[in-house]
């Protein structure tokens, strides 16, 4: 428009780096990071991140070089989420559960210049590096240790940090769409892919996550989401923007969570359904009461019964749907005021859905992949969940073919199946390869898993299809009972019949297996393992449904 101009006065490329610069000024003397006896202020955190960026730059890193890290949720990772991009680099936090071969695959693909490794994972990191064959120069290893007197042949993190210049000028992105992070998918559907996040997407998603999780200024965030998973759902950047406290955890269990909430007066955290289930079913000796409500964002819907238990313990849980390709969280189940006037069972059912796109996503829909049209809003028609907007990945690193396949017709096509309810809210039903075809009808496992969770004796459950001579496939439930609890197969099946009422009888399990339910490190059920177990059981005859 005539008389206007873009200049440095009115345009700065969006980047989470801005959050840290502001936090050091506005919240400088306030606590930023807590980990055991370690405690920093925002002024100190900014200083440490600048020194880290300077030390990395002194190694001769070029813009967009990769810096890798393998560590639990410790302060060094928080600093790397700023220090690496402030050096112009791209951070890749690797999955701490990867074995040496998976790590070697990730390192060979990303070719990092520097590799920060927590001493707990040093042996597997060294083994993975020994497997590399196509990298001319292996990365420089810097060890993260909690014992400064620990002997190591590698330079330690704090020593490396001390070489940095506190007056270093952070490198900003030239374009806000420049890469800031690489994240490997969990690999539940295929070999893990490497997803590229941009400065712009990270900035927008971080702000959206804070609003979704009902964060207030200066929150206290418990770091329960692994930082290797979708950049920790962008929460490190979020809490920085809000001037809060990041409570780091080396391990996550129910006792640590309750103790941390009370000790640090935690206001917010994120968690997968298994984490929430663990909290809901914690032993009475572990549970602790607190006179405030803790806001929880769940990356996946939990059964209403679990939500009710959490509510009574002092947690307000908002459900969300997402994946690595959409920066972790792509939707949120925003609670409507009128839901509070409904009977509790109906209110919880509505709140247990996956919701709608948050304000940093342009749209979410359930589309027929052939017609490219939206499905009826009937809560029944199962098709593919698709999203688009500014917080969708830039693409798959070094995989143009996969990127083009994922971006079709102006949408990112997930590998997840869902439905749309009459009010427009999305419900995730199953992974595309996990849906069960019963008598020619596509059936998701999510609802029946929720029913199984509501059984008083059931601690965990996963449902897959088992070969069936009559239906093609029928429901096979793998159930883990609570400690000391007892239940028989017939009892579980009858319970599902009663709960389903007049709904689709094909959802009733024909087989119940009592066993552990294998999970990925991020809490997703390893359906491929369960499917093989069900297949190895052979065909089942259809039970008569009374």
UniProtKB/Swiss-Prot annotation:
Enzyme class: ligase
GO molecular function, one term: ligase activity
A Pfam family the protein falls into: AMP-binding_C
InterPro entries, per the entry: AMP-bd_C, AMP-bd_C_sf, AMP-binding_CS, AMP-dep_synth/lig_dom, ANL_N_sf
SUPFAM superfamilies: Acetyl-CoA synthetase-like
Domain of life from the UniProt record: Eukaryota
Alphabetic keyword roster: Fatty acid metabolism, Ligase, Lipid metabolism
Keyword Lyase among UniProt keywords: no
Tagged with keyword Ligase: yes
GO biological process terms held by the UniProt record: fatty acid metabolic process
EC number: 6.2.1.-
UniProt record similarity statement: Belongs to the ATP-dependent AMP-binding enzyme family.
Its job: May act as an acid--thiol ligase that activates carboxylic acids by forming acyl-CoAs.
Protein name as it appears in the record: Probable acyl-activating enzyme 21
């Amino acid at each position: 428009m005539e008389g206007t101009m873009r200049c440095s006065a009115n345009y700065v490329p969006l980047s989470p780096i801005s959050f840290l610069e502001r936090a050091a000024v506005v919240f400088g003397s306030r606590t930023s990071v807590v980990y055991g006896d370690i405690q920093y202020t925002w002024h100190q955190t900014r200083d440490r991140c600048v020194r880290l960026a300077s030390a990395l730059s002194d190694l001769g890193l070029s813009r967009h070089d990769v810096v890798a890290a393998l560590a639990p949720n410790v302060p060094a990772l928080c600093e790397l989420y700023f220090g690496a991009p402030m050096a112009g680099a791209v951070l890749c936090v690797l999955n701490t559960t990867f074995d040496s071969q998976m790590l070697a695959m990730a390192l060979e693909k990303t070719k990092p210049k520097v590799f920060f490794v927590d001493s707990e994972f040093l042996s597997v990191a060294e083994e993975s590096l020994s497997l590399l064959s196509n990298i001319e120069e292996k990365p420089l290893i810097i060890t993260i240790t909690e014992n400064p007197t620990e002997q190591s042949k590698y330079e330690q993190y704090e020593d490396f940090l001390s070489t940095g210049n506190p007056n270093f000028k952070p490198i900003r992105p030239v374009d806000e769409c420049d890469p800031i992070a690489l994240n490997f998918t969990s690999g539940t559907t295929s070999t893990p892919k490497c997803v590229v996040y941009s400065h712009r997407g990270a900035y927008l998603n971080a702000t959206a996550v804070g609003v979704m999780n009902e964060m207030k200024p200066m929150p206290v965030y418990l770091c329960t989401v692994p930082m290797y998973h979708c950049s920790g759902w962008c929460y490190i950047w979020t809490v920085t923007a809000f001037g809060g406290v990041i409570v780091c955890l080396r391990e996550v269990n129910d006792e640590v969570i309750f103790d941390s909430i009370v000790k640090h007066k935690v206001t917010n955290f994120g968690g997968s359904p298994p984490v929430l289930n663990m909290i809901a079913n914690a032993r009475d000796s572990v549970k602790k009461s607190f006179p405030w409500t803790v806001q929880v964002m769940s990356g996946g819907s939990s059964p209403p019964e679990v939500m009710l238990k959490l509510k009574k313990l002092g947690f307000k849980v908002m459900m969300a749907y997402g994946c690595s390709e959409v920066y972790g969280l792509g939707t949120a189940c925003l609670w409507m005021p009128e839901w509070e006037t409904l009977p509790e069972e109906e209110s919880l059912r509505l709140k247990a859905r996956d919701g709608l796109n948050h304000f940093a996503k342009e749209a979410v829909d359930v589309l027929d992949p052939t017609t490219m049209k939206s499905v009826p809003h009937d809560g029944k028609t199962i098709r593919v969940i698709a999203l688009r907007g500014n917080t969708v990945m830039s693409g798959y690193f070094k995989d143009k073919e996969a990127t083009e396949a994922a971006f079709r017709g102006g949408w990112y096509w997930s590998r997840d199946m869902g439905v749309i309810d009459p009010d427009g809210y999305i419900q995730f039903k199953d992974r595309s390869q996990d849906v069960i075809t019963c008598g020619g009808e596509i059936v998701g496992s999510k609802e029946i898993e929720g029913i199984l969770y509501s059984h008083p004796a059931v601690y965990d459950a996963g449902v897959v299809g088992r070969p069936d001579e009559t239906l093609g496939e029928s429901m096979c439930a793998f159930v883990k009972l609570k400690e000391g609890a007892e239940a028989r197969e017939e009892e579980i099946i009858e319970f599902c019949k009663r709960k389903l009422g007049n709904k689709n009888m094909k959802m009733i399990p024909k087989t119940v297996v009592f066993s552990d339910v294998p999970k990925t490190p991020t809490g997703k059920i390893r359906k491929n393992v369960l499917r093989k177990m069900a297949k190895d059981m052979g065909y089942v005859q259809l039970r008569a449904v009374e």
